Amino acid sequence: MEEQQNINQEPEVKQVKKKSLGMEIWEWTYSILLAVVIALLIKNFLFSTTIVKGESMLPTLQPNNMLVIDRLSQIRGIMPERGDVITVEAPEATSDEGIAQYSEVNGLFNKLIHSFTKVLYVKRVIGLPGDEIEIEGNELRINGELMKEDYINEPMRYNPYLIDKIKVPEGHVFVMGDNRNNSKDSRYFGVVPFEKIEGEAIFRFWPFNKFGGI
């Protein structure tokens, strides 16, 4: 009889405690903040993406090409090699010594905003620390040697550049666009400090018919 009573007993129903509105808001806020932190870590220490603006890198890169930028080398302090395509923060001016100038950004919040809003240029590394760069007419010489570049499609026309002769100081690079006649680069704003290099452009993922390495 006792066994029959046990069989007929209904299982105990556990009540699930309903989350409060405050708890739900906190969980959503936490998830969003975590996603932002992860995105920032990836962008600043691993990889980022950029969209090519303008025609300064023709014919290598076209306007609206989308690129993957490798941040690891810059984070580890490895200087890029001559010929690398890199992204650099757009300078605001140049000094009398031919060094690109930038405004100082102070405060954690301001630096965070700046990391998302700063303008980037896509350029090719031409000169490394210690190199003597000389531009005369349509000729580019590095350490006295005439450079032959198969990635440009027309000769450089002479313009009265602000900087046509310079020895690249330590910790800096001299950059130029492949479209030499339509590029704002180190000929105008000077050599770029290493810390203003965003990273190396290693991959093009748009458009799909140009999908692949650079």
Predicted regions located by residue number:
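Soluble "head" domains of membrane/secretory-pathway proteins
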Residues: 2-25, 41, 45, 51, ...
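Hydrophobic membrane-insertion alpha-helices, especially the h-region
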Residues: 29-45
